[in-house]
């Protein structure tokens, strides 16, 4: 019999314990209570006393112990004199690491109740004793350190070198793990509970058969708030809490499975201490056992080395203000731990990905991904997490990840693509640009004002230049509808589509700076001679067969798509006699491309506002506005809301596994169209008025008839404009 749980937001939710232990089925109201309880099912004791060798499972027990600790009384009673294997076999143990018996048999030698004893003993003997009250405060306020090593800059786990680490993960055959453990490389979305329907949102959903409604509720909220969650389409806090609960349950279940499977894998994976007998035992004795069976631990170490590099070797005027220390190293390992990477990427896919969808979810592999991209995606996931500590911890690493992304060799290389070449083999370059774009996102919406200005004025300009170096015209598809299934290369399609969407989103961010910060555009429409993005059904297909089928269905061989560029589509949109075929094509391509077209209209309006006496632009802008409205209505009537991939976060029928497929904030494209329409109308009225004087006096009058201040970090003047439109014209 299935158990019915109350929906989030119902009266009984606040009293119902919703977090369940998968081992003993006990329930808890708070997630941290469940985490504390899970520790009772293991032998790990992460809270350690620096004065003696005492180790505890809970911080409050350590706190009570420190009040009475005399600095060594418990050492003799807590130290294990025999390894686990010798204890089980009831044999004498030499107490070495590894002991003589385990070394002779080639078995894994573990001392489960005295993890890291030699490390703590050496630290205790070389460190002066601090006053007890100070030690109590320090040990209790700081969380238990994650696995740390003093030799990360020269030695990797399993005796790997940096060269081995850089080559790891580039091929499915280049792995040290049992195939069964590879199930964690590209996990599916967790089994989220069905999100509750909270009723209509405060704004009307634009995807409907009606004309675009005259309201700017979303843009009003967008320009009056800061932060990714407050600005974009990330669901309610209750919905994100449910996602977090399911992610935690899945990660805990996987962790327990790995721990339980370790005895069976112990004979297959030698102990790192056996493989490296000459290494410092303190560097690996503190590593949790599940890390040695977790392929993502390599990515954690890669990120750690990159962070250490940008912190210790700061360039001039570096934005990184941190100093490298063992505490910072431990904090980095804890934030980018394998379990946190999985959790943060779970938030990225379910909450954030629909808003900026240029990473191909079905083929994304965490092990093969660049560490810079993985770190940037993890930061976005932490920013949209419902847990405040995740949000605060993410800000610590904003500037570090920004620095390591923009100094990355792949990002700064001079590589250019050939249109006829194999773009799929240049995935590292594409991922480097994706990482740079994600950095621009989280810094512009979550960073400090100085970070926002730096991104807008310098980093984004570098990103646009890198896109031009790659070649915007290289972002084109082959005519897949002319290819048979045996000729269709899914990876090649995915790489080209990622590049097209990446350049599209770069243009959209450029347009956002134009609209909301009144910054002159860095990209011009005439240079965007690339294909438009294929429909979402093609990009979201989970198999090569399904993708090939969707391409044939939406984009037949004779359709205009294969011969039309983004520039050509916009030029056609500005004509007064737009053909029916082009209308149907643009409606078929979906909301992302329509959002890009309405953003292009804003770019033209900025040029119109900034030009002197160029009123000939008024007619093309009016044509584009009229044609876009008709195409959006055609799209809304052809692809009704509630059908994949045109579902929204408010849809009551959305399935948990389809959260990443929903439409993001670009479903509010009609509001962008309405803002452009109102601005064009105001410019038309202002254009008919004649100046009072032939020569305008020096330092008098506004710089611009609509927005007076250029390159403004705050969106206040745009919000004032929107409020004025809603008050006087709607």
UniProtKB/Swiss-Prot annotation:
GO terms for molecular function: DNA-binding transcription factor activity, RNA polymerase II-specific; RNA polymerase II cis-regulatory region sequence-specific DNA binding; zinc ion binding. Residues 120-151 are annotated as: Disordered. It comes from the Eukaryota. One of its GO terms (cellular component) is nucleus. Residues 83-109 bind DNA. Keywords: DNA-binding, Metal-binding, Nucleus, Repeat, Transcription, Transcription regulation, Zinc, Zinc-finger. It holds the Pfam family Zn_clus. SUPFAM superfamilies: beta-beta-alpha zinc fingers, Zn2/Cys6 DNA-binding domain. Coiled coil: none annotated. The keyword rRNA processing does not apply. It is found in: Nucleus. Residues 120-129 have a biased composition (Polar residues). Gene3D superfamilies: Classic Zinc Finger (3.30.160.60), Zn(2)-C6 fungal-type DNA-binding domain (4.10.240.10). A zinc finger (C2H2-type) spans 19-41, 47-69. One of its GO terms (biological process) is DNA-templated transcription. The keyword Transcription regulation applies. Its main location: nucleus. Transcription factor; part of the gene cluster that mediates the biosynthesis of the neurotoxin verrucosidin, a methylated alpha-pyrone polyketide that inhibits oxidative phosphorylation in mitochondria and thereby causes neurological diseases. This is Transcription factor verF. It comes from Penicillium polonicum. The lineage of its organism: Eukaryota, Fungi, Dikarya, Ascomycota, Pezizomycotina.
């Amino acid at each position: 019999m299935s158990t019915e749980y109350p929906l989030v937001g119902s009266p009984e939710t606040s009293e119902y314990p919703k977090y369940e232990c998968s081992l003993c089925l006990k329930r808890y109201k708070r997630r941290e209570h469940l985490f504390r309880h899970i520790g009772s099912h293991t032998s790990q004791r992460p809270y350690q006393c620096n004065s003696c060798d005492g180790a505890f499972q809970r911080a409050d027990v350590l706190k009570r112990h420190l009040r009475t600790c005399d600095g060594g009384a418990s050492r003799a009673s807590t130290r294990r004199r025999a390894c686990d294997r010798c204890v089980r076999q009831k044999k004498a143990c030499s107490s070495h690491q590894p002991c003589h018996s385990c070394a002779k048999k080639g078995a894994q030698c573990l001392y489960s109740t005295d993890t890291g004893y030699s490390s703590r003993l050496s630290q205790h003997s070389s460190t002066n004793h601090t006053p007890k009250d100070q030690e109590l405060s320090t040990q209790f306020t700081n969380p238990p350190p994650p696995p740390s090593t003093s030799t990360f800059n020269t030695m990797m786990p399993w005796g790997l070198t940096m060269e081995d680490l850089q080559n790891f993960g580039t091929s499915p055959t280049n792995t040290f793990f049992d195939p069964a453990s590879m199930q964690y490389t590209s996990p599916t979305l967790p089994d989220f509970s069905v999100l509750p329907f909270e009723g209509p949102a405060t704004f009307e959903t634009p995807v409907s058969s009606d004309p675009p409604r005259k309201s700017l509720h979303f843009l009003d909220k967008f320009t009056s708030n800061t932060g990714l969650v407050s600005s974009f389409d990330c669901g309610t806090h209750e919905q994100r809490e449910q996602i977090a609960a399911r992610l935690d349950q899945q990660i805990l279940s996987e962790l327990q499975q790995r721990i339980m499977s370790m005895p069976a894998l112990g004979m297959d994976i030698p102990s790192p201490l056996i493989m490296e007998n000459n290494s410092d035992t303190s560097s690996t004795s503190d590593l949790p056992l599940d890390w040695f069976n977790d392929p993502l631990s390599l990515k954690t170490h890669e990120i750690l080395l990159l962070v250490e590099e940008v912190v210790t070797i700061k360039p001039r005027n570096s934005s990184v203000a941190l100093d490298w220390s063992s505490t910072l190293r431990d904090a980095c390992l804890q934030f980018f731990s394998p379990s946190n990477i999985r959790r943060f990427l779970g938030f990225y896919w379910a909450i954030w990905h629909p808003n900026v969808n240029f990473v191909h979810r079905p083929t994304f592999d965490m092990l093969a991904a660049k560490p810079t991209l993985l770190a940037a995606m993890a930061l976005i996931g932490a920013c949209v997490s419902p847990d405040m500590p995740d949000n605060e911890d993410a800000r610590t690493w904003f500037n570090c990840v920004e620095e390591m992304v923009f100094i990355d060799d792949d990002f700064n290389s001079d590589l250019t693509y050939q249109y006829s070449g194999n773009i799929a083999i240049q995935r590292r370059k594409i991922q480097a640009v994706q990482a740079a774009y994600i950095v621009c996102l989280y810094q512009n919406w979550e960073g400090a004002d100085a970070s926002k200005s730096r991104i807008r004025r310098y980093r984004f300009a570098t990103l646009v230049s890198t896109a031009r170096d790659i070649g915007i015209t290289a972002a084109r598809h082959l005519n897949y509808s002319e290819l048979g299934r045996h000729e269709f290369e899914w990876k090649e399609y995915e790489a080209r589509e990622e590049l097209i969407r990446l350049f599209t989103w770069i243009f959209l961010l450029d347009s956002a700076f134009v609209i909301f910060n009144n910054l002159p555009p860095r990209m011009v429409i005439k240079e965007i001679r690339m294909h438009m993005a294929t429909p979402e059904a093609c990009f979201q297909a989970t198999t090569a067969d399904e993708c090939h089928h969707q391409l044939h269905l939406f984009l037949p061989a004779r359709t205009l798509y294969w011969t039309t560029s983004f520039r050509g589509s916009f030029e056609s949109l500005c004509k007064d006699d737009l053909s029916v075929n082009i209308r149907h094509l643009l409606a078929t391509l979906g909301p992302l491309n329509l959002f890009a077209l309405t953003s292009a209209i804003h770019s033209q309006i900025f040029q119109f506002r900034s030009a002197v006496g160029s009123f000939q632009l008024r007619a093309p802008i009016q044509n584009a506005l009229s044609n876009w409205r008709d195409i959006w209505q055609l799209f809304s009537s052809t692809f009704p809301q509630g059908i994949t991939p045109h579902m929204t976060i408010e849809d009551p029928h959305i399935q948990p596994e389809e959260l990443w497929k929903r439409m993001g904030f670009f479903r509010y494209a009609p509001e962008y169209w309405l803002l452009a329409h109102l601005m064009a109308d105001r410019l038309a009225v202002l254009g008919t008025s004649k100046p009072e004087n032939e020569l305008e006096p020096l330092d008098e009058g506004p710089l611009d008839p609509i927005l007076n201040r250029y390159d403004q970090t705050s969106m206040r003047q745009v919000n004032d404009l929107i409020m004025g439109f809603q008050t006087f014209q709607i």
